Amino acid sequence: ADTVSGAALFKANCAQCHVGGGNLVNRAKTLKKEALEKYNMYSAKAIIAQVTHGKGAMPAFGIRLKAEQIENVAAYVLEQADNGWKK
């Protein structure tokens, strides 16, 4: 997966609600490693499924983004979670 492409896609599609790995809609369910682990989302497979199909307040992006793009976003999210969202 291409995390550089994932970063650009994240900025364009996800950062409105998830800036800096946070969550402006549900503050408990951030993209930080601890929250991803707590909610069983700390895997590319889980992130890809949620981004593709949406859940709750989060819209589905499977219509707007190609599978490869969603994989790149998931790789970027996991990379950032591992690095504490410092970049």
Swiss-Prot record:
Q: Which GO terms describe its molecular function?
A: electron transfer activity; heme binding; iron ion binding
Where does this polypeptide localize? Cellular thylakoid lumen
Annotated TM spans: none
Oligomeric form and interacting partners? Monomer.
User: What is the purpose of this protein?
Assistant: Functions as an electron carrier between membrane-bound cytochrome b6-f and photosystem I in oxygenic photosynthesis.
Q: Which family does it belong to?
A: Belongs to the cytochrome c family. PetJ subfamily.
Record the organism.
Aphanizomenon flos-aquae
Which Pfam families does this chain map to?
Answer: Cytochrome_CBB3
- Gene3D superfamilies referenced in this protein's UniProt entry, alphabetically: Cytochrome c-like domain
Which positions in this protein are listed as binding heme c?
A: 14, 17-18, 58
- The entry's protein name is Cytochrome c6
UniProt entry tagged with the keyword Heme: yes
- Sorted alphabetically, which keywords does the UniProt record give? Electron transport, Heme, Iron, Metal-binding, Photosynthesis, Thylakoid, Transport
Please name the gene that encodes this protein: petJ
Q: Is-annotated flag, keyword Transport?
A: yes
Give a short account of its post-translational modification. Binds 1 heme c group covalently per subunit.
Listed under GO cellular component are: plasma membrane-derived thylakoid lumen
Gene Ontology annotations of biological process type: photosynthesis
